Amino acid sequence: MDHYFPDVPGLGNVALSRHAQARMVEDGISEHDLKEALLNGSTTPDGQDVLWREKDGVRVVILRQPMPFKGAMLAKTVYRVRPAARATK
């Protein structure tokens, strides 16, 4: 499994944490699904230091400036997103 992704569009270098790798196994997320979300997903900022990349129900939570900073953003966790319930009339 790749744990380092150089030159991710719009982000630069991204490293995948051990926690994120473990969550992928727990949730049954394939490496292909991770790459699709990371490389082609929509980006949502969540405060100054965190952003998400999400595609096809897979969300990658990324720290922009992890400490200690080693020159890459850190994909802190990966998980499946379930659609929210919607009320119908």
Regions found by a protein language model. Give the residues of each.
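Ribonuclease/tRNase effector modules and their secretory precursors
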Residues: 1-89
